Design a protein with these regions (language model features):
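Active-site neighborhoods and metal-handling regions in enzymes and metal-associated proteins
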Residues: 1-426
Length: 426
């Protein structure tokens, strides 16, 4: 293998920890994908999206991972060699991140696209693998579908991948629990520096310092275009009533028009609600939590609104806990919010209202299913979801949010839950 020598000790996490995805995880994921491909009637798939390369191959190097369906051409069941990673750069890092000598798949240099289909054919592949048409840019997908046309037409495998990633493994949940521990320290930092006269951006900076020191890489991954999100939304008073381009309850002013959401230069004023919505990622895995702060005392009208949103949250949790559909949780949550007089302010102000009460999280912030109309299925076992009913008025916003998971016993919070108060006073 050509190129500079790779010292594995240079690629460790804090205090010498090995932060690679365990080989056993990669092996199980690839096997499960092969099974799901067969069930979907697809001969195989070419994984090219960076997030999914990390999920299946252990790293997001520039390349692609071919995974054949169970029993299909190229699979070990059919006499082939099984999954193979084709890497442009960095090949050495790809080998290391996949487990080195223990990697569950072969890793080799990416051939010229002119001969790519032939290289797959040499591995026993007789049909064009599916591509991630729902994830990668159209021009990129077209280039590969044309290169593979000698094997036939490529189908879309996006849904198969998304469906598999909905249920998290024990290891993934442990990553999210680790993230939640860091997140508590982020809220503690906001509590320590906050008060009347402190800017929203200064509050974000305090939380950001904790998150960065614990390994946050600076990017919150999104599934929906334009793939942009501010990982810390802190809005005080009237800033909380400003809508933005982002499909969420709370917009925020932001520092300038290109970053027109989240924290801006507004300063905390006495007795005004300050909403703090913080995300932390541990080894790529997202947890999302919102709490309220106030310098002085929270006005009674805002206290009542918060109590109502906590009641809506409890309804949503109860429905999902029973294993009923996410759409049912939306219907019942919306019905209670409407009954309590919040129809025009739930998850934003008309006409800029978001139509959901919870969103799944994982390696991306906006995964499925969602507590919204049309998601006529339960939250899956192993699913992880941020549940976040909020109300927005011109003078501010209020609500709560925790990230939950569902197991055989029902829902349980991964983030603080009742361990951090709904309102913290400076």
């Amino acid at each position: 293998m050509e190129g500079p020598a790779l010292n594995a000790e240079d690629l460790l996490g804090p205090d010498g920890e090995d932060w690679r995805v365990p080989v056993s995880e990669l092996e199980h994921r690839q096997g499960e994908l092969a099974h799901r491909l067969r069930e979907a009637g697809l001969p195989g798939i070419l994984i090219q999206h960076p997030i999914d390369l990390y999920y299946y191959a252990g790293g997001r190097q520039n390349g692609a991972l071919f995974v054949p369906a169970e029993g299909a051409g190229g699979s070990k069941d059919a006499g082939g060699d099984g999954p193979v990673g084709y890497v442009r750069r960095s090949l050495r890092r790809a080998v290391h991140e996949a487990g080195g000598d223990d990697a569950p798949h072969e890793i080799t240099a990416f051939p010229s696209l002119r001969v790519f289909a032939e290289r797959l054919r040499e591995r026993g592949v007789s049909e064009a693998p599916a591509l991630q048409f729902g994830e990668v840019p159209s021009s990129f997908a077209t280039r590969f579908s044309q290169a593979l046309s000698g094997l036939g037409a490529s189908s879309d495998g996006t849904g198969v991948v998304h469906a598999q990633r909905e249920s998290k493994s024990t290891w993934e949940l442990a990553c999210m629990e680790e993230a939640a521990g860091v997140q508590i320290r982020m809220f503690e930092a906001v509590e320590a520096v906050g008060g009347e006269g402190v800017s929203e951006l200064d509050l974000v900076a305090a939380a950001e310092a904790v998150s960065r020191s614990e390994g946050f890489a600076g990017q919150v991954e999104m599934r929906r275009y334009p793939l942009q999100c501010d990982r810390a939304v802190v809005v005080s008073g009237r800033s909380g009533g400003v809508s933005s381009f982002f499909d969420s309850a709370v917009g925020g002013v932001g520092p300038h028009p290109l970053s027109g959401m989240g924290a801006g230069f507004a300063k905390v004023k006495a007795n005004e609600p300050v909403l703090v919505d913080l995300v932390h990622l541990h080894r790529g895995y997202v947890v999302d939590m919102t709490r309220m702060f106030v310098a002085g005392s929270m006005p009674k009208v805002w206290e009542e609104r918060l109590e109502d949103m906590i009641a809506v949250k409890e309804v949503v949790v109860d429905v999902l806990d029973r294993g009923e559909h996410c759409s049912k949780a939306w219907e019942e949550g919306l019905a209670l919010a409407t009954e309590l007089g919040h129809a025009d302010h739930l998850m934003g102000m008309a006409p800029d209202q978001s139509r959901f009460l919870g969103h799944s999280v994982g390696l991306q912030l906006d995964e499925a299913p969602v507590v919204a109309k049309g998601f006529d299925r339960p939250m899956p076992l192993g699913g992880t979801m941020a549940i976040e009913p909020k109300v927005v008025h011109q003078e501010g916003c209020i609500g709560s949010e925790d990230t939950w998971t569902r197991d055989e016993d029902g829902l349980r919070p991964l983030t603080a839950g009742g361990a951090w108060p709904w309102v913290t006073t400076w």
